[in-house]
């Protein structure tokens, strides 16, 4: 099955307004960065009548898939975008602190720290070594359940 690119490019050419015609032998050059162009008369474009008539092949002057027009438009856009300047950086949010033990984790905490010599004991006292976040988290974390999670890890990681 074909891609339909020749049909879609013909449809796009029919829908174009006179201002969007490519600069060619009968079109005026861009003046002072404006996009006004003088429309090309139909007699000056050899492939215009051939494209409109069904069953006829377009002239070899017009590309069958519109690649030249696409490349020209992309080059024009690239030239315009160079004048825009760098984009403004997005504001950054402070990182949230996450709890050390996550319920439902597939890997046992003891197994994940076996190969690390200075890792110490996995089940520390709640809140030890952690800084309080500057603002309250959207989801509150219940520190009283940490002992329960540690006992479950010990039982299932034997």
Swiss-Prot record:
Keywords: Cell membrane, Cell projection, Cilium, Cytoplasm, Cytoskeleton, Lipoprotein, Membrane, Myristate. It comes from the Eukaryota. It is a lipid-anchor. Expressed at high levels in the kidney and pancreas. Moderate expression seen in the skeletal muscle, liver and heart. A weak expression seen in the brain, lung, uterus, prostate, testis, small intestine and colon. A motif (Ciliary targeting motif) lies at residues 29-33. A lipid is attached at residue 2 (N-myristoyl glycine). It is found in: Cell projection, Cilium membrane; Cytoplasm, Cytoskeleton, Cilium axoneme. Residues 65-75 have a biased composition (Basic and acidic residues). Its main location: membrane. Residues 19-32, 39-52 have a biased composition (Low complexity). GO terms for cellular component: ciliary membrane; cilium; cytoskeleton; cytosol. Residues 1-146 are annotated as: Disordered. The keyword Lipoprotein applies. Interacts (when myristoylated) with UNC119 and UNC119B; interaction is required for localization to cilium. This is Cystin-1. It comes from Homo sapiens. The gene is CYS1.
């Amino acid at each position: 099955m074909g891609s339909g690119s020749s049909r879609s490019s013909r449809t796009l050419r029919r829908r174009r307004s006179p201002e969007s015609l490519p600069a060619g032998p009968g079109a005026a050059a861009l003046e002072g960065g404006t996009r006004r162009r003088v429309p090309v008369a139909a007699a000056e474009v050899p492939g215009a009548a051939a494209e409109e008539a069904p069953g006829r092949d377009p002239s070899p002057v017009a590309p069958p898939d519109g690649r030249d027009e696409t490349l020209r438009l992309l080059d024009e856009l690239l030239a315009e975008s160079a004048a825009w300047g760098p984009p403004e950086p997005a504001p950054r949010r402070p990182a949230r602190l996450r709890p050390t033990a996550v319920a439902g984790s597939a890997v046992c905490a003891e197994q994940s720290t076996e190969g690390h010599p200075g890792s110490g004991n996995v089940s520390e006292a709640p809140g030890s070594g952690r800084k309080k976040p500057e603002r309250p988290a959207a989801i509150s974390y219940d520190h009283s359940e940490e002992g329960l999670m540690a006992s479950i890890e010990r039982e299932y990681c034997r």
